[in-house]
Amino acid sequence: MHPLPEYPRPAMRRDSYENLNGLWKYAITQTAEYPAAWDGSILVPYSPETKASGVGRTLQPGQWLHYHCTFAPPPGEGGRVLLHFGAVDDACAVQVNGHLVGGHRGGYWPFTLDVTAQLNDTGRNSLWVAVQDPTDSGTQARGKQTLKPGGMFYPAQSGIWQTVWLERVPENYIQSLTVTPDYDARTVTVKAHTSMPGGAVNLWAVVRAGGVTIAEDWGNDEADRDGEVTLNIPEEHFFPWSSDTPFLYDLTVGTTQGGEEQFDTVHSYFALRKWSCEPDARGVLRFCLNGKPILLNGLLDQGYWPQGLYTPPSDAAVERELSEVKALGFNLLRKHAKIEPQRWYYHCDRLGLVVWQDMVNGGSRYNLWFVTYLTNVLQPLVRRLPDAEPLWGLLSRGKASSRETYRKELQATVEALRCHPCIGCWVPFNEGWGQFDAAGAVQAIRTLDDTRLVDEASGWYDQGGGDVCSIHNYFYPLHVKPGSRTVALSEYGGIAWPMPGHEAPGKTYGYGTAKSRADLTARCKKLQLGTVLPQLKKGLSALVYTQLTDVEDEVNGLFTYDRAEIKPDANAVRSVNAALAAEFAKVTR
């Protein structure tokens, strides 16, 4: 049985699929050489630091983590065989049958290797992956990972942490899709990026709504390797995506070249929806979905699991958690300091959960007093401090190479996730962690994707750009003032309660501590109805409570770390969310 057996890339599916998750051999050594002996078995795709992996060892900077398995090629003959990795943290080299087939750097992004030339088609094949991960001794994106966990920073994880799989594809195949819906024009433009070395690419696309074909067309692009087609959505089949009605259109794309009868076919989906910031009936600037004001009310979600750290126990566990969030009356998750596997976003797409996506923070080791502790307390003094070059060193981006790495990571993030309708806002920087030239980051995002909002600097070191005036407030009275950007309370709350029987050993962390379920419920209700609700009429348009679940010794989640219990009273949470929605509807009319 393969862990996480579901097809890992719902937005670009093929029928050919061979899952390689399962027990592999592993070794941790001091060199990049093939290990003389193996240390044991590891359950892929769980990192060696996790309980689920069966290993429970931390990879140190400078060490090498080696993986080995054998595999048979996918069924079929001819074409190409592709080896896909959902994510490997952080840098890796991959060999098949003793031949280097490629590598990758960056622990949060998928990559694909063509292994056709190295395969033994009639027998078993040897796969060796060698990994290094500097964690917080490097400057690469790492999120909340640290080798010295505590408080708001958590244990490191390394190596393969998303699904590994094989596909057999035609000789000329689709490498990626760019799908761009246009809500106002009621169209969708599909561009297929192919492996074809030259000549005209014929692209065929069909759109279905509820199983009924509603649009289809051929495109012919004489440009090298790529084909493009734009399809019109009939008015009678125009179903906008929203949190209440998250309608997804099915999309099938096929290609051929020069009139040949050899097709590659992939299946995808898309939605028609539009994000904007517009004045409400009273002239106050609001977030708008499909031209209508929307209160975005949600939770900070860091995506950690007690047994698997970054990797969930199952797809069903992910789906269940997201469904529970929706059932409580929330419509937003801020994905904080992590990029999830593609299936997480797919479930948000179909459930109607809006996602604000952080770029994963990196940079040199943080001066926490400067970027977190003092800034949290002295926020009014530092909020508009410029993130110009004199500050880059203090904000952990002193090296030009680190800044260039961030730019590449930003591009990789947008390109990997822009296919998902659920994403409503990009967040390039959080609380100054590795921040530099936020205005440049906003421009880079808009060049890559101008269909979403941008929260330039979540928390502080606000440079006045982007679409969002983004406030983190755990300690001060809340006073919202309308301005030229829409106002979001992008972090608040964080009330801790270590629920008996579900608490982590050691110290607990949070922003104020409740004594019981009743006390936690009362505190949350007072904060949200007494402090937050009155600010809605003044322009507050998005709320992100800290946080969805407990994480390690940070025990300020609505749910316990093991997801077994909701900590405040669930009916009270639903009642508060209904009251916030009703008040927002009232003050925006």
Q: What are the language-model segments listed below?
A:
Residues 1-347, 351-355, 409, 424-425, ...:
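Secreted/periplasmic carbohydrate-active enzymes, especially glycoside hydrolases
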Residues 332-577, 583-589:
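Substrate-binding/catalytic cleft of secreted carbohydrate-active enzymes
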